[in-house]
């Protein structure tokens, strides 16, 4: 009679042991310490506090020692995305409300990450142009409230600058890494491609946010750095030196550009009453209580409404900004995302999240169609429809008159690649994961020739060296 009971007990013991073993082996920190001798997984949380909304990027990484020698020591297996609106800058008068706005995102992260992994999951929040444009005290008050919420989230946030305002140039660098990692232009698991990154295989990244726009690429001809001093970022990527050309143009984001263009068309006396007039909207149309940078505006259409008039003002604004001519990229496909993609999607230039290839002239053609619409046609309830003429005209002028691409310039519009968002989030996730590994002990990889070395140098981490602002990997150090 004791044998059946003993059998049940033995089966239960081995079932429990199997669960514990699976938990330990599946997660890199399954038993509370780092286990990296087998394929394992871990999470990193990045919160993008943009000018128009706050976005959760929850990345599930997989580390596979068997393929580490073919490229990345770990890579993103899955991304979970969620967005809340408005952006943090909208809570300038109530910083605590800014912190409260994060709660749906934190709750989603807590739901997706197993509880025993919370303290082993690094979290970071980076604010962008929306907070950069606020007066210093307001931005600081919001960040202080948000930082407290992040630090009490249950996730790991005990490293420097876990919550801060990200420099625009960092957005560009991280976006470039995300794009090229997803496209596998830097490293790939295919041995026939080769593991040495090369400029000619990489692609240029153009990001259009609400307050700023960024461009980043790896030039084949380094003479461009002499022509545009201060736009260089030197990095060491997996032991390979890369000189990136990158810059962020504050005030040239889509929403900021709207206000700048409208102000060019409006007399100062009228503007002082918070009224703006634009030829980018039809006569008789009024958009009331439009908010930007803590101010409200009433916008009125004009009798001179046309693509030609709208383009004339937009071109003046673009040419007065610091956007530069990029000769090397002429004729080569460049990747555009964020608002570039959104407005192309609204106009039917691309279908769905997969994006597609177009030529620059198609933005002009879409703008001409949008600028012919009458008052009744643009008042359909879509938040973007009244702005479509101006937005498309600005995008065309930015690329044509700013970067001076020809109308036949090939453009690749992207929102997701391999089911993951094209943004700076994934690039930052690698850096954040590295900071955490420095704290916990780095994942080992066959990439190093030293048997006792780690991959501290294999996972990029933003480290600024002197005035050159060098983005580098840590050199290999012994355990």
Swiss-Prot record:
Main location: membrane
Subcellular location per the Swiss-Prot or TrEMBL entry: Endomembrane system
Induction: By stress such as high temperature or ethanol.
Signal peptide: none
Family, as annotated: Belongs to the GDA1/CD39 NTPase family.
Role: Hydrolyzes UDP and GDP but not any other nucleoside di-, mono- or triphosphates. May promote reglycosylation reactions involved in glycoproteins folding and quality control in the endoplasmic reticulum.
Entry protein name: Nucleoside-diphosphatase uda-1
């Amino acid at each position: 009679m004791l044998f059946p009971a003993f059998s049940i007990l033995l089966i239960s013991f081995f079932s429990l042991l199997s669960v514990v073993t699976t938990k330990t082996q599946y997660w890199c920190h399954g038993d509370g310490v780092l286990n990296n001798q087998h394929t394992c997984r871990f999470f990193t949380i990045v919160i993008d506090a943009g000018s128009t909304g706050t976005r959760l990027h929850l990345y599930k990484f997989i580390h596979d020692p068997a393929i580490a020698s073919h490229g990345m020591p770990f890579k993103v297996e899955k991304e979970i995305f969620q967005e809340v609106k408005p952006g943090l800058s909208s809570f300038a008068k109530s910083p605590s409300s800014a912190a409260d706005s994060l709660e749906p995102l934190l709750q989603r992260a807590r739901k997706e990450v197993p509880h025993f992994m919370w303290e082993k999951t690094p979290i970071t929040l980076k604010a962008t142009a929306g907070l950069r444009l606020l007066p210093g005290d307001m931005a600081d008050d919001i960040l202080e409230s948000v930082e407290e919420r992040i630090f009490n989230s249950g996730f790991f946030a005990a490293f420097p600058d876990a919550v801060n305002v990200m420099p625009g140039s960092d957005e560009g660098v991280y976006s470039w890494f995300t794009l090229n990692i997803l496209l596998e232009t830097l490293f790939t698991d295919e041995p026939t491609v080769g593991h040495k990154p090369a400029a000619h295989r990489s692609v240029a990244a153009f990001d259009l946010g609400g307050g700023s726009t960024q461009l980043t690429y790896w030039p084949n001809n380094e003479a461009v750095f002499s022509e545009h001093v201060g736009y260089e970022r030197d990095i060491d990527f997996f032991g390979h030196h890369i000189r990136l050309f990158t810059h962020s143009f504050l005030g040239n984001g889509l929403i900021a550009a709207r206000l700048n263009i409208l102000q060019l068309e409006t007399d100062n006396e009228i503007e002082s009453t918070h009224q703006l007039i634009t030829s980018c909207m039809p006569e008789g149309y009024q958009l009331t209580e439009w908010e930007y940078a803590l101010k409200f505006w009433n916008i009125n259409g004009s009798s001179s409404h046309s693509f030609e008039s709208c383009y004339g003002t937009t071109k003046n604004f673009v040419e007065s900004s610091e956007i530069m001519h990029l000769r090397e990229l002429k004729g080569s496909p460049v990747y555009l995302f964020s608002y570039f993609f959104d407005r192309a999607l609204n106009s039917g230039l691309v279908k769905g999240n997969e994006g597609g290839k177009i030529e620059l002239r198609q933005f002009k053609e879409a703008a001409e169609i949008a600028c012919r619409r009458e008052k009744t046609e643009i008042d359909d309830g879509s938040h973007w429809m009244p702005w479509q003429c101006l937005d498309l005209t600005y995008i065309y002028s930015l690329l044509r008159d700013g970067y001076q691409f020809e109308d036949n310039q090939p453009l690749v519009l992207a929102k997701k690649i391999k089911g993951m968002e094209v943004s700076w989030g994934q690039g930052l996730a690698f850096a954040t994961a590295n900071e955490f590994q420095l704290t916990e002990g780095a994942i080992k990889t066959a990439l190093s020739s030293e048997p006792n070395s780690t991959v501290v140098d294999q996972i990029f981490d933003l480290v600024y060296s002197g005035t050159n602002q060098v983005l580098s990997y840590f050199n290999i150090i012994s355990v």
